[in-house]
Amino acid sequence: MAMLPVAQLYARDVPDLRAPEGTDLLQVLWCPFDHPIMPRTALFWRSAATVTDILGTPPEPPAMQFDGYLPEPCLLHPEQVTEYPDHLELSTELQEQLRQWSVPQAAEEDMDPQTYYDCVLSNAPGWKVGGWPAWDSTDPSPRPCPECGTRMEVLLTIATFEEGDDEGRSWSPYENPAAEPSPDLDHFDPGRPTAVQIGSGYRQHLSICPAAPEHPHIELMT
């Protein structure tokens, strides 16, 4: 079964993409079937200068488990943001300080202070490079490198939805007013521009070893 292209990122466009020495291009592919609960991914770090035989249109697979495993082609306009760990990765003392601080902030936006930090400040929703995983569907779990034991860091988040849970849409990207969906996409959804669906609407995090990116990566659904 041929693997499908999922993302192609150039280091020149994505400041947080820490490419291994001698490479400046990351290509992410996956198998469009669950292994066992989400597509299995493969990472290829390359030098863009060596990529000369370029396909205009990637081949579609003869079969796939779900339509949501065939990404719609998209052009990226990277936007750098600052985010913070999910509240579940913070100490109990810091969680309480954040809860108290969030009360007046949440009141101004008519939001629940219990969820204000996670919705508005901690994790940027959508597809992203680097950053922190959201733990709204499972508890935090250790992510040691299977080769050397180093704590792994998120390389790429593949998300079902681009928008967050706050009504103020604090994480909405800066949009190019002239940008419009391709005329070929009669079902374009700005909240899901890639049309990818992970599980019942979750995220698939790909994490790599910061000490040696060539070590096997791990995958996690949240």
Region spans (language model):
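Preference for intrinsically disordered or flexible, low-complexity segments
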Residues: 1-222
